[in-house]
Design a protein with these regions (language model features):
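Short beta-strand segments
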Residues: 18-51, 57-59, 65-69, 78-81
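Alpha-helix boundary recognition
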Residues: 14-15, 60-61, 120
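Short, surface-exposed beta-strand-loop junctions and turns on beta-sheet-rich folds
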Residues: 53-55, 74, 143-144
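A short, polar/charged loop/turn motif at coil->beta-strand junctions and beta-hairpin connectors
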Residues: 13-16, 75, 123
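Short amphipathic alpha-helical segments and helix-helix/interface helices
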Residues: 10-11, 56, 95, 99
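Charged, gly/pro-rich active-site loop segments
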Residues: 1-5, 77-161
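Short, basic/aromatic recognition patches
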Residues: 1-21
C-alpha cells in the first residue's frame, strides 16, 4: 500500500521539476487531458496557455479541473489536485519562471526569445488552480534498498547494460 504524503511533502513534490497533466471538461463532459508545464507557489498551480486554447475555453465554461503530477520512475509517487481553475490575465514574470524551471537559465532565455512572437500573436492567459482536495501516493516505503540501488545504477549506466 502506498503511504500518503503530508502537506509539506506534497508541496515539496509539486515544487519539483515534473510535467503536470491537466484535465478539463469538454462541452459534452468528456475529460480533455493535456501535459503542461506549471509553477507551484503560494498554494496554487500556475500554468500558461493561449487565450482561446481548448484548455482556456473549457475552464471558462466549467472551472472544475484535475491536475496529476507523477514520478514516472520507481519509487512511484504522485499528487493529484482537484479544484477549480480561474483564467487570469498574463502575470508578470510567470513565463520566465516556467521557462527557467524546465529549461534552466540559458535554455529558458532562448525559449522565451524564440517563442515571444507566437505568444504575442495568440495572446496568453494564466490558469490558476487552487487545490480543494489533494490525493497523494508514495510507494517509496515499498521499494527495498536493493531495488533503489539497482534503479540508481540503471540511471547511471549506459542503455542496454
Amino acid at each position: 500500500m502506498p503511504k500518503r504524503m503530508s502537506r509539506a511533502e506534497w508541496e515539496r513534490f509539486l515544487a519539483g521539476r515534473r510535467v503536470a497533466v491537466l484535465a478539463t471538461l469538454a462541452p459534452d463532459g468528456q475529460p480533455v487531458l493535456t501535459p503542461i508545464w506549471y509553477v507551484y507557489r503560494d498554494g496554487a498551480l500556475y500554468m500558461r496557455t493561449g487565450l482561446e486554447s481548448i484548455k482556456a475555453r473549457n475552464v471558462r465554461r466549467d472551472p472544475r479541473v484535475t491536475v496529476c503530477v507523477q514520478d514516472e520512475r520507481p519509487p512511484y509517487r504522485s499528487v493529484t489536485v482537484y479544484g477549480r481553475a480561474t483564467v487570469e490575465p498574463e502575470q508578470e514574470g510567470l513565463d520566465a519562471a516556467i521557462a527557467r524551471r524546465y529549461l534552466g537559465t540559458v535554455g529558458g532565455a532562448f525559449y522565451l526569445r524564440t517563442a515571444r512572437e507566437a505568444v504575442e500573436q495568440s495572446g496568453e492567459v494564466t490558469l490558476v488552480v487552487r487545490p480543494e482536495r489533494v490525493l497523494t501516493q508514495d510507494f517509496s516505503p515499498e521499494t527495498p534498498l536493493v531495488g533503489r540501488l539497482w534503479l540508481l545504477a540503471k540511471r547511471l549506466l549506459p542503455p542496454g547494460l
